[in-house]
Curated annotation (Swiss-Prot):
A Pfam family hit: Kunitz_BPTI
Residues in BPTI/Kunitz inhibitor domain copies: 1072-1122
The protein's assembly and partners: Trimer or homomer. Secreted as a 135 kDa monomer under reducing conditions and as a homotrimer under non-reducing conditions.
Protein name (database record): Collagen alpha-1(XXVIII) chain
Domain Collagen-like: 243-274, 301-360, 383-405, 501-544, 545-583, 730-769
One term of GO molecular function: serine-type endopeptidase inhibitor activity
Compositionally biased tracts (Pro residues): 642-654
Region entry Disordered, spans: 242-769, 999-1066
Annotated Basic and acidic residues bias: 291-309, 735-753
Amino acid sequence: MWNRYFVFYLLLLSAFTSQTVSGQRKKGPKSNLLARKSDVQGSICFIDIVFIVDSSESSKIALFDKQKDFVDSLSDKIFQLTPGRSLEYDIKLAALQFSSSVQIDPPFSSWKDLQTFKQKVKSMNLIGQGTFSYYAISNATRLLKREGRKDGVKVVLLMTDGIDHPKNPDVQSISEDARISGISFITIALSTVVNEAKLRLISGDSSSEPTLLLSDPTLVDKIQDRLDILFEKKCERKICECEKGDPGDPGPPGTHGNPGIKGERGPKGNPGNAQKGEAGERGPGGIPGYKGDKGERGECGKPGIKGDKGSPGPYGPKGPRGIQGITGPPGDPGPKGFQGNKGEPGPPGPYGSPGAPGIGQQGIKGERGQEGRPGAPGPIGVGEPGQPGPRGPEGVPGERGLPGEGFPGPKGEKGSEGPTGPQGLQGLSIKGEKGDIGPVGPQGPMGIPGIGSQGEQGIQGPIGPPGPQGPAGQGLPGSKGEVGQMGPTGPRGPVGIGVQGPKGEPGSIGLPGQPGVPGEDGAAGKKGEAGLPGARGPEGPPGKGQPGPKGDEGKKGSKGNQGQRGLPGPEGPKGEPGIMGPFGMPGTSIPGPPGPKGDRGGPGIPGFKGEPGLSIRGPKGVQGPRGPVGAPGLKGDGYPGVPGPRGLPGPPGPMGLRGVGDTGAKGEPGVRGPPGPSGPRGVGTQGPKGDTGQKGLPGPPGPPGYGSQGIKGEQGPQGFPGPKGTMGHGLPGQKGEHGERGDVGKKGDKGEIGEPGSPGKQGLQGPKGDLGLTKEEIIKLITEICGCGPKCKETPLELVFVIDSSESVGPENFQIIKNFVKTMADRVALDLATARIGIINYSHKVEKVANLKQFSSKDDFKLAVDNMQYLGEGTYTATALQAANDMFEDARPGVKKVALVITDGQTDSRDKEKLTEVVKNASDTNVEIFVIGVVKKNDPNFEIFHKEMNLIATDPEHVYQFDDFFTLQDTLKQKLFQKICEDFDSYLVQIFGSSSPQPGFGMSGEELSESTPEPQKEISESLSVTRDQDEDDKAPEPTWADDLPATTSSEATTTPRPLLSTPVDGAEDPRCLEALKPGNCGEYVVRWYYDKQVNSCARFWFSGCNGSGNRFNSEKECQETCIQG
């Protein structure tokens, strides 16, 4: 029988302890199946990782493949991470690539296994356009929030160089929001050319942490270690983190004592009846057993029941304004909102396509006309509001109207500070409520001294008994008395009646008072925040099983031994404050260190009236320094005194700070009241320009106005040409501003030969002149004046710039290219008769900025270059060259055609045009292609890009390679034009009949040996340099042409002549005396003409018709016909 009771007792104990978790009893029983399921979920840590691959144009080919290899290697390492203890990792991976668009493949929803994930990453294809990291971060954040698992660890691995497209939104706010929501970022730089500040802005790392590089051979191990630490930190917190529940019931007493001594087995009883007997009486409770040893710390308990919702906290500070997000689907129309503040002007949008011709935009603001006569009123038009006009003359103040009626409108913005008005009359005195304590005002002026003379000091008399307290006296305050000794505290007198006197000087510091009575206990504080999770305890013993069936009632056990004395119980609640004890004797007056500020005590008991102290008048001390102004006293209980005389007006106070507050809701329009009184003359500023209204119908033309000339307005944007208006009537305007200097005009035709003048008298012999210029000095002078020489200025040329505007170039380098193009244009004579220039700007699309027939002015050409927009996407070089071939179809026959390609990367593989075919077509149409390639030799794609540059260029010598764009402008101009034009060295050789000039007289420091002289270029022209030559009688500039036919040996031989030749007028053929006229047709050929001033022949371009007779087919024919002597 005892054995059955003992078993029942053990089962009851195990059932009781199973309801207890970490010293708290749960409020209700739960299924053990659910408990086991919770344990299984608590031992698994969910991990979601997103790989972001940079698929922009700057990471094509090698870098893009390297990113995919890195994802493949790191994903294997991630699945090799093993957690400690009984924890398990449940990992899912996702990947996305970004450029100007985002492609998510694979997402979390399609996760199967690691091998499938790696295959999808390897199948990624390059997008190859601009870098927009904002959209990559926003899509990754949205993917983790939508498909990531709740309470899991979320990690984003971003690979980029941090150099985004100029139109990329700011990534700071979106990355901060993602980190606040629990997403961790790890950024990896693609190369050493990286914007480290932006990567740290995204990841939130400090500047002391080094930047991770994709080229680092140990990168996979570094990130594996970082992820291992991150997972261990976040997963531990997830498992042991328990929600704070309501306080549990008080715990049970200590464990039961040991069971009593087993009794002897009694004799077997007779079998009873089959009927169940009644339950026996409950036996008396046993004596508590000995208190058991303190058990080990158990594991973290299961989360308790969720606590009650706390009181709402205060509103946090207003956060910074977020950047504009991606446009979502249109939502349902909401209620009418409040009127918001005027927004900041947005960035300029992209240029739209030209619309259909219609009513033109507003033209340039015209000059103000004379005051016109008022015309007849026209019909009411429906049009858009114009710009605010100038301020009109001030009107006469109107009469004061009746006060208006209506609801108060919204508070307007603070106006400008007006002039100080005159002092108003004294208003009715109505005592208001006591205001808040204002700031301490400035010290007032010293008052007028009181009337009276100070008496002599009397002899101190005997101390008399204190008399009764008299009524409050009236009179002027006397002079300040000497500081007496501290007397005992007297009783508090009644409240006085009278005017408050001036504030007295601060007294000496009093003795410390008696300690106050302890204050009452404060109210219970609010529930505290959840504490940090404690360290995981050691493994506990296996849990108890479920209670078994109720056993038979056992026999009453013997009385146990007396237990040991228990530990003292918890401290009881704080008692009520006791009765105040008698005052103790004053202690020593040595002040101790100040203690912590205690709780505010209750009001003390008023003390007894003290006896008057003994006062011995001492000598008058030196007046102490003026003490600080004390705080204003409390409001008195007296009656209001007699109103004093009106004081002098005080100085105006300082202007208060502008209030800060949100704009209130706009009220409903009130009932229109009668017109109010005319206000004072306002001083305001012109308001902001209103929004442009809808375009109105054109109104009828008004009568011609008669106006006076106004001030010249600022130049507005160029509008579309409008219809020709009727002839106006007005006065002539002011003289316009001096325009910019135009291009230098072509040299005029030579005039007709004048009749010979009468011979003059022989002059006196002049003094001997200085030595003439040497040949080297003449060469240097021509080089410095002519630059590339007259050849480039006069040679007919068709030149097309093909400019790379892809993402890898960048906006700064694109600006350098534009400056370079404008500088190159200055080296040629830009007009329709000589050189014509076209421009192609390309990236993933091709923009024809200017064709060959469009510009004949350098200013217009440079303006078109300045207006070119940076595209910042892919590199479609083949399509751009095909556009250049199409542009050369308008070239003049027989004129040299040159295409100059400026790029920094190889063409995109997705380009529809084939580069080899486009280059072959250019070669078949005699188009020379020069290539300027900007790429470093240590670039991984250098070899591929260099082969492509050689493929594009007509000749390997037409390829120029630079490490960066900064050296483009200074080192290329002369060198490139020595290739495009004829070699300047051969030009100087043919003039002076000698070898190359000495070093130092080359093309702006460039060695002329870099250009190979072409033997067919020949000039037969003598250059005369004398001291007495008339300045107006200069030799004409020679003209050249490229691609001239090779001359015969007889033509190539020039007969040496002296540098100084005397002009001869006796030419037999009249053609030699005609002025040079090249004609006006387009079939240009090379001819020779005779120059009488220098008695020599020179080449020129003959248009094919309508020229002068002074032209010959060869130099020999010209010399034999015209040169005499």
